[in-house]
């Protein structure tokens, strides 16, 4: 049974597709009032419409997480529409691939602006409303790439995701007096629109690298975010939950053999 969050005001950034959409839909399903945030208003409103059609409460807003003005307006919209801010799921992120030797300062800055500065701006914009309530939940979507593993051609992305965890720990300590917790979810390979675009053979290879022999669902990540935002996680802060089907476990690529279907 999913933890009910009836009436809680939640903001989800990067919520028009993939993991962010899964998080928004899951929070809507448990009674939260969801502010769906995307760069394009039509995309945000489409996801909000799905939540409303399923009996939930949601509103879509357009905002760029790398813009301080947009993040301030986002927080104000949540307060105006839903009476405050209880939960922030800072999910927005980009993950382009560029060989390190060919990476420009612009390539690097674009990733850092969205993934690191965007996290900072989203969190700080929501703090006044959370501090006023002396309570809050902040959940970051990080990655196993950077904090735990490395991937070729994604040096800037790996650096940004590792930076998020440093931010998480320091922020958790600083915000604890207001009973605001700060945690992170670290996804492994998740079945999203972007991953499907790599082609079936590449997807098969990725599935084979996971001990549970499947890619994760966006709802696997959403369920972890939901737990960290719940009352049951009120004594958990500065922690990261790896949701990867055991992807980081195999030593030297060694995994248990497949089961015989006939056994």
Write out the residue ranges for each language-model feature.
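Active-site helix of classical SDR
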Residues: 123, 160, 168
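Alpha-helical segment proximal to the catalytic Tyr-Lys
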Residues: 128, 173-174, 234
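Short, small/polar-rich loop/turn modules that mediate ligand/substrate recognition or access, typified
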Residues: 176, 181, 236-238
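Substrate-binding pocket helix/loop in short-chain dehydrogenase/reductase
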Residues: 99-100, 107-109, 195, 206
């Amino acid at each position: 049974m999913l933890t009910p969050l009836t009436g809680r005001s939640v903001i989800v950034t990067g919520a028009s597709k993939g993991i962010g959409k899964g998080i928004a839909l899951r929070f809507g399903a448990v009674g939260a009032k969801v502010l769906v945030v995307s760069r394009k208003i039509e995309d945000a409103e489409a996801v909000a419409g799905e939540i409303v059609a399923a009996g939930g409460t949601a509103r879509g807003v357009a905002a760029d997480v790398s813009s301080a003005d947009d993040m301030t307006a986002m927080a104000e919209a949540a307060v105006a529409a839903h009476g405050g801010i209880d939960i922030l799921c800072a999910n927005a992120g980009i993950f382009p691939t560029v060989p390190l030797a060919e990476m420009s300062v612009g390539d690097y800055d674009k990733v850092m602006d969205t993934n690191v500065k965007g996290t900072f701006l989203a969190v700080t914009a929501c703090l006044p409303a959370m501090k006023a309530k002396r309570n809050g939940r902040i959940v970051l979507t990080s990655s196993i790439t950077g904090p735990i593993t490395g991937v070729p051609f994604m040096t800037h992305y790996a650096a940004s995701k590792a930076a998020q965890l440093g931010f998480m720990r320091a922020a958790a300590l600083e915000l604890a007096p207001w009973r605001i917790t700060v945690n992170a979810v670290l996804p492994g390979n998740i079945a999203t629109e972007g991953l499907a675009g790599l082609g079936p053979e590449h997807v098969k290879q990725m599935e084979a690298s996971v001990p549970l022999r499947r890619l994760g669902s966006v709802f696997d990540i959403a369920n972890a975010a939901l737990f960290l935002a719940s009352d049951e996680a009120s004594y958990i802060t500065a922690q990261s939950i790896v949701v990867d089907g055991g992807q980081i476990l195999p030593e030297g690529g060694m995994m248990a053999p497949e089961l015989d279907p006939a056994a």
